[in-house]
Design a protein with these regions (language model features):
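Entry/N-cap segments of selected transmembrane alpha helices
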Residues: 42-47, 62-93, 144, 208-239, ...
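Structural signature of hydrophobic alpha-helical transmembrane segments
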Residues: 38-54, 100-114, 159-173, 218-230, ...
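Juxtamembrane helix-boundary/capping and inter-helix hinge elements in multi-pass membrane proteins
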Residues: 62-72, 95-103, 113-135, 141-144, ...
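Hydrophobic alpha-helical transmembrane segments in multi-pass integral membrane proteins
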Residues: 28-29, 87-94, 148-157, 203-217, ...
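Membrane-embedded alpha-helical segments of transport systems
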Residues: 80-88, 112-117, 133-154, 255-263, ...
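Transmembrane alpha-helices that form the ion-translocation and gating core
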Residues: 75-114, 221-271, 298-306
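Cytoplasmic-side transmembrane-helix entry/capping segments in multi-pass membrane proteins
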Residues: 12-18, 70-83, 131-140, 188-200, ...
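Hydrophobic transmembrane alpha-helices of secondary-active transporters
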Residues: 19-30, 42-73, 172-182, 191-216, ...
Length: 317
């Protein structure tokens, strides 16, 4: 008996990404010990090695001529995402008494300015062009507390180690060298990009739990909607300004898991916001879960809209 698993996943918006991620989340929530038994089972929960392989594959699809375009797109999208989060946060702080339906400016800035790098790679790998995926070299900068600290006036405390930057760039450069030296190797490696998406989607899911969603409550879900929908629309427009299809912009409309630690990092610097940080942390966790669902749906929706117009988003203009 045959079960049409792939056809079912294809019918779900972002299904190849969302379903494995949700399965991983359910496993982490209800059967955490099963994932910690060791060996190859636990290895399936490690996203980093799979993402490293994906970086090499992405690099192999890029010609040296396309690299500056990817850097430009990544820079614009990163800047716009940062500016969007800061603008909304400052508006809430200045004109709404630092309270938007129970959400503080700290929570808004931390959630909206950070993005889930693994989710971005999976979605651009499935729906976007190689330039879209290559933009990750720059968009990776917003995965953490650095930009949030800048926004809150504490940039002197936060640093991004140079070695961390190199660790992102080197696998992509290795892939670029291989792909530019041998067209057959480029073609061979291109066949692997879509195959590994469900695997690191599952691994990303094992870093989330449904408890995060419950703890954040309705306000955390609203924060996720603001990040994915409002932020996503702005990012799609910004992406198109760079000559892109909008896929990279939609794929960047998430909240990074690392953002959950941002309020505590800020509170260590400025203890006066410790109370706000305690409330913001579960809200950001809920936003992470919410955007992990909404961002793939938004990206899939936009990809289908482009296809109806006769535009193939996987092909760069």
């Amino acid at each position: 008996m045959q079960i049409p698993i792939k056809k079912t996943l294809d019918r779900i918006p972002g299904g190849m990404m969302v379903v494995p991620l949700f399965i991983g989340c359910l496993m982490k929530t209800f059967f955490p010990d099963a994932l910690a038994m060791g060996g190859f089972v636990t290895a399936l929960t490690q996203a980093s090695p799979i993402m490293a392989m994906f970086f090499v594959i992405v690099g192999a699809q890029m010609s040296f001529k396309e690299a500056p375009k990817a850097m430009w797109r990544g820079s614009v999208l990163t800047g716009v995402k940062f500016a969007t989060g800061v603008a909304i946060g400052l508006f809430v702080a200045k004109f709404m008494g630092d309270n938007l339906l129970g959400i503080s400016s700290l929570a808004i800035i931390a959630a909206v300015t950070n993005s889930n790098g693994g989710l971005f790679l999976a979605l651009t790998g499935q729906y976007g062009s190689k330039t879209d995926s290559g933009a990750y070299v720059v968009t990776a900068l917003n995965d953490g507390p650095f930009f949030t600290m800048i926004a809150l006036g504490t940039a002197g405390i936060a640093t991004i180690p140079f070695s961390a930057m190199l660790s992102v760039v080197i696998p992509i450069i290795i892939g670029m060298i291989i792909g530019n030296l041998d067209e057959e190797m480029r073609e061979f490696m291109s066949q692997g990009s879509s195959k590994i998406i469900p695997f690191f989607s599952f691994a990303l899911g094992t870093g989330l739990t449904l408890k995060m969603l419950v703890a954040g409550g309705i306000s955390g879900i609203i924060l996720g909607i603001i990040t994915a929908v409002l932020g996503g629309i702005i990012l799609i427009i910004a992406d198109k300004v760079t000559g892109g299809s909008g896929i990279a912009g939609a794929a960047l409309s998430s909240t990074a898991g690392n953002a959950v630690a941002t309020p505590a990092a800020i509170a260590d610097v400025d203890p006066t916001i410790a109370a706000a940080a305690a409330i913001a942390t579960p809200q950001i966790a809920a936003s992470t879960i919410t955007t992990a669902i909404l961002t793939p749906i938004l990206t899939s929706f936009w990809a289908k809209k482009l296809e109806k117009r006769g535009i193939d988003p996987t092909i760069e203009k």
